[in-house]
Structure formats: C-alpha cells, structure tokens
C-alpha cells in the first residue's frame, strides 16, 4: 500500500531516491572521510558562495519541511528569528522522546556530519553565530558519533572561525541530557 502527502503533491511514499539516508548503507557513514567522499559539505560551500538572504529564500521556496510530526516549513521557521535581537541562537533538539521514534537517532548515529552541515547552513541563512545541540542522555552512540564528527568538522575548518575562509563563524555546543526516570521527574 502506498500513501501520498498533501504538502508534497505528486509524492508517493517509496518512489523517490533516498536523500537523508543515502549514506546509511556504508559501515563508515559517520566519518568525515565518507561524508566528503559522498559530496558532504558541498551544500555549505554553495551556501557560503551567496548572500545569506538568498539561501534563506531558496530553502523557503523549496518548501523544505522539518522532520518533526508537524512538518513545519524550515524557511518559515528560519524567518521567525527576530532581526533586532542579539545574540540569537539555533537550538537543535535531539531528544526524540516520542515513543517508537528513531528518525533523529539514526541520523545522529549514522550520518552526524549531515546534521552538522544542516546546522551550519541554518545558522548562515538566519544570521546566527552559535548553535546548541541537545542529545538525549540514553543515546550514548549518538552522543559519541556527533561529538567525534564535531571534532572532525572543527579540525577541517567547517565549524569555528571564518569557516572555509569566509567571514562566517559558528560555534556548536553539545549538551547531553541526563536521562529520564519514567517521565523526566
């Protein structure tokens, strides 16, 4: 049985190439070497080659949707950032506490550089210089892989000061949850 999505006319589940999960089949999918070998950070390079407002408009016009249950348009969300308030931050919630949900966990465990690149592009488009990335306490492998990927990205010049020789700088701060007892009390 196939299903269609009202917000993506013409889309039938299962009839498109894998985009988010395309690297999952590789045993070393979480490394910077695999990420770069499969065109990783090309989106960041492309974003930095144009004005931030153009990147924001491109995401908005492409109707890129969030991965949460509401499918909120990313370009719209990025536009909600108050322009007159400083400092501004990107906060990424990797808690994924909905029962039976593993979409974010798999991305963090198997392709953390894709998450980091997305954070960087969002920060660039929205004019942000710091990102806080929260990962649920029970997700030890996700924590390990994201931390290792972030160290690789800093060492390679994808995160930090003057990214890839540009005037754009972003720091990403990782925060681990402590775990939950029943419902987090």
List each model region and its residues:
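Feature of Fe-S/electron-transfer and energy-metabolism proteins
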Residues: 1-185
